[in-house]
């Protein structure tokens, strides 16, 4: 079995543990967290693992094959460096470091060593996006011309969490920046962003960006955690439209079921399957396959994918500051939203109560 250590036992660390425990290919050897409450929970949920508050024992243990990095972004550069120096394979949350410069340094480090590295750009591992791309590749919609992506939820409120990853267009939006690039199979050429400072918060918490790729495909990406935080019954708006010269592909979901419409020149297919969540099961399967065969799985997201998406999300976010950036609402409403979320037990993107290392 592949021995794995989890560093950071907040929300994502717990997701990884659940998937590792379901797999017959992994053994969780260590869980590390600096927070005593997180370590206590780790003891309870993973009695088979050694729970520690320092990473050095993990790196010195030659039996550990893989480290999974789920602590805050500011710690990832040093943890990636230590892991690769110790000969470990690495699964990291995004972004892979706290600054663009540090991210590209980690890309160069990873690409210059013989260990397998990957990052949880989970949309690339979803059944629905892979099904859509196969349909596009078959020629059924003609040439792909327009990519439209929208993801708005009542998710993290400003100041609530993930501040080390920046405003939500970087923290969450970089997934969609990466997804558009993956569909286009091209690099970004132009971008223009319009933001909104909801509740008069200092940073835009909603952004729409549109532009072109180098191959001529156009895109628009809309992302924000602004979608009805105080609604009695909360909902969200998430979809992808791929528009070709002859047909279209459309996907939407309710976080439980994904609905896909494929409308080509010879075939119409409508499919519904379970959404799949963060798709961590597929990510760790790809890592296990790579380790056991000695050949990197081509579908496994790379550090370079993450760095490009992070850099472009920052550029788009910064572009929004150079246009008119209106502010609507007030900080009192924002504080009411935060208070509501502190007391919610069922909602969008709620953080664990002990959220220091989420």
Located regions from the model:
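N-terminal Rossmann-like dinucleotide-binding module
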Residues: 1-46
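Active-site loop of classical SDR/Rossmann-like NAD(P)-dependent oxidoreductases
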Residues: 15, 34-37, 272-285, 301
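Beta-loop-alpha module in the N-terminal Rossmann-like domain of NAD(P)-dependent dehydrogenases
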Residues: 16, 46-109
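Glycine- and charged-residue-rich phosphate/anionic-cofactor binding loop of Rossmann-like
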Residues: 27-29, 268-274, 290-308
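A contiguous active-site-proximal alpha/beta segment in oxidoreductase catalytic domains
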Residues: 74, 97-157
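Mid-domain beta-loop-alpha active-site segment that forms a flexible
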Residues: 120-128, 151, 155-192, 199-206, ...
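Contiguous beta-strand/loop segments that form the cofactor/metal-binding neighborhood of enzyme cores
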Residues: 177-259, 274, 282-295, 314-315, ...
């Amino acid at each position: 079995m592949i021995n794995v250590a989890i560093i950071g036992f907040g929300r994502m660390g717990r997701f990884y543990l659940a998937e590792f425990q379901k797999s017959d290919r992994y053994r969780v050897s260590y869980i590390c967290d600096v927070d005593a409450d997180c370590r206590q929970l780790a003891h309870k949920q993973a009695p088979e693992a050694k729970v520690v508050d320092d990473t050095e024992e993990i790196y010195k243990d030659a039996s550990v094959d893989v480290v999974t990095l789920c602590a805050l972004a500011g710690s990832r550069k040093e943890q990636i460096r230590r892991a690769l120096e110790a000969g470990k394979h690495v699964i990291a949350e995004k972004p892979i470091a706290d600054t663009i410069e540090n991210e590209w340094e980690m890309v160069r480090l990873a690409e210059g060593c013989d260990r397998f590295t990957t990052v949880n750009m989970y949309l690339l591992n979803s059944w629905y996006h892979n099904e859509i791309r196969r349909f596009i590749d078959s020629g059924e919609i003609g040439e792909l011309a327009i990519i439209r992506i929208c993801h708005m939820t009542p998710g993290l409120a400003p100041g609530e969490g993930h501040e080390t990853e920046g405003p939500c267009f970087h923290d969450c939006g970089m997934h969609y920046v990466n997804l558009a690039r993956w569909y286009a199979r091209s690099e970004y050429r132009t971008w223009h962003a319009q933001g909104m400072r909801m509740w008069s918060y200092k940073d835009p918490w909603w952004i729409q960006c549109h532009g072109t790729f180098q191959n001529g495909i156009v895109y628009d990406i809309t992302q924000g955690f602004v979608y009805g935080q105080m609604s009695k019954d909360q909902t969200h708006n998430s979809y992808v439209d791929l528009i070709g010269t002859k047909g279209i592909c459309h996907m939407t979901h309710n976080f439980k079921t994904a609905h896909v419409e494929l409308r080509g020149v010879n075939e119409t297919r409508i499919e519904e399957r379970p959404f799949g969540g963060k798709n961590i099961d597929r990510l760790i399967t790809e890592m296990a396959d790579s380790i056991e065969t000695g050949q990197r799985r081509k579908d496994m997201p790379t550090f370079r994918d993450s760095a490009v998406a992070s850099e472009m999300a920052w550029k788009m976010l910064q572009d929004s500051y150079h246009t008119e950036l209106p502010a609507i609402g007030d900080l009192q409403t924002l504080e009411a939203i935060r208070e509501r979320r502190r007391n919610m037990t069922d909602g969008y993107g709620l953080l664990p109560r002990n959220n220091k290392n989420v």
